[in-house]
């Protein structure tokens, strides 16, 4: 799939979610005949939820949407990227894994319009842009991702005084 088409589909996917959530009619490009494949770590029940969201995308755009999840996502996505057979859209559960994929040339940078949308609409927008910007295979920073379904699982609380007192 060409980069331009991927960006159109990505933009349409997120715009159709927002449009239907607010009861508005989708007015993006007609994607009839296009197929969008998404791969991620979600299995039941999240997999069914993602497929329901995909059905909204299909209704809005005319495209076909497929989501596949795997309990060995982290290994499989890297194999797929190296083989050149990755899905159109990939849901990375960790920014570090996305950074590794970018460093091997596996991610397509998103446009400045998507970056501006994040800056304008996400609380602490610049922080989200920074977390979504990774060095490509040439070492150039590229804006590559949009965060959604985020949660905090690895927050560490500590006392700076105790930390310093113990020489950490």
Model-predicted segments: where are they?
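Aromatic-glycine-rich donor-binding/catalytic loop that engages nucleotide-sugar donors
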Residues: 161-168
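Hinge/lid segment of periplasmic solute-binding proteins
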Residues: 24-30, 95-158
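Alpha-to-beta junction loops
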Residues: 81-92, 106
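Short, well-ordered beta-strand elements
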Residues: 32-43, 63-68, 89
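Short, low-complexity disordered leader/linker segments with a strong preference
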Residues: 1-36
């Amino acid at each position: 799939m060409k980069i331009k088409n991927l960006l159109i589909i990505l933009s349409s996917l997120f715009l159709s979610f927002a449009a239907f959530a607010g009861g508005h009619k989708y007015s993006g490009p007609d994607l009839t005949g296009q197929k969008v494949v998404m791969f991620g770590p979600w299995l039941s029940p999240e997999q069914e939820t993602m497929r329901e969201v995909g059905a909204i995308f299909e209704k809005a755009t005319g495209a076909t949407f497929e989501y596949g999840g795997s309990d060995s996502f982290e290994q499989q996505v890297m194999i797929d990227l190296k083989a050149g057979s990755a899905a159109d859209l990939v849901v990375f559960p960790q920014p570090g894994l996305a950074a590794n994929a970018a460093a091997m040339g596996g991610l397509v940078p998103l446009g400045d319009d998507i970056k501006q949308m994040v800056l304008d609409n996400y609380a602490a927008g610049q922080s989200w842009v920074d977390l979504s910007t990774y060095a490509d295979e040439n070492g150039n920073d590229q804006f590559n991702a949009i965060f959604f379904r985020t949660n905090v699982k690895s927050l560490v609380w500590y006392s700076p005084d105790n930390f310093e007192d113990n020489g950490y």
